[in-house]
């Protein structure tokens, strides 16, 4: 009997394929997004050094008590704004967006648009 591959396996396949092409540098680090059912996480990574430069999530102390839910588009937009603010304070303006195989829709799109509105270029 044929077994249909699950959505996470397909997403992981897309993520691996794209990660061969996307690489964050010191001049233009990679903005990585991870989405769970309850929260959303974003990091800006310099792949040359293997270092996370800036990170934000719905579990960050700045957002934890202020959001009714961490798993909706409003929370994702708040994470995008916080990430952009932290990145600009760290001197990062230009990034490469790595959606990690997720469809550019909903929470991923809300985070990306809020980060762009906050001053990040990608």
UniProtKB/Swiss-Prot annotation:
Gene3D superfamilies recorded: 3.30.420.100
Entry's Gene Ontology molecular function annotations: 5S rRNA binding; structural constituent of ribosome
Keywords: Ribonucleoprotein, Ribosomal protein, RNA-binding, rRNA-binding
UniProt feature, compositional bias: Basic and acidic residues: 1-11
First and last residue of the signal peptide: none
Region of interest (Disordered), residue spans: 1-22
Single GO cellular component term: cytosolic large ribosomal subunit
Pfam annotation, one family: Ribosomal_L18p
Example of a GO biological process term: translation
Domain of life assignment: Bacteria
Biased composition (Basic residues): 12-22
Function according to Swiss-Prot or TrEMBL: This is one of the proteins that bind and probably mediate the attachment of the 5S RNA into the large ribosomal subunit, where it forms part of the central protuberance.
NCBIfam families, per the entry: L18_bact (TIGR00060)
Assembly, per entry: Part of the 50S ribosomal subunit; part of the 5S rRNA/L5/L18/L25 subcomplex. Contacts the 5S and 23S rRNAs.
UniProt similarity note: Belongs to the universal ribosomal protein uL18 family.
Record-given protein name: Large ribosomal subunit protein uL18
């Amino acid at each position: 009997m044929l077994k249909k591959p699950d959505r996470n396996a397909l997403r992981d396949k897309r993520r691996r394929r794209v990660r061969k092409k996307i690489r964050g540098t010191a001049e233009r680090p990679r903005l990585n997004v991870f989405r769970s059912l309850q929260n959303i996480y974003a990091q800006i990574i310099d792949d040359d050094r293997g270092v996370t430069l800036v990170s934000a999530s719905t579990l960050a102390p700045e957002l934890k008590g202020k959001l009714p839910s961490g798993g909706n588009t409003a929370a994702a937009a708040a994470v995008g704004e916080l990430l952009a603010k932290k990145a600009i304070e760290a001197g990062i303006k230009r990034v490469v967006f790595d959606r990690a195989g997720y469809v550019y829709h909903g929470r991923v799109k809300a985070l990306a648009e809020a980060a762009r509105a906050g001053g990040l270029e990608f």
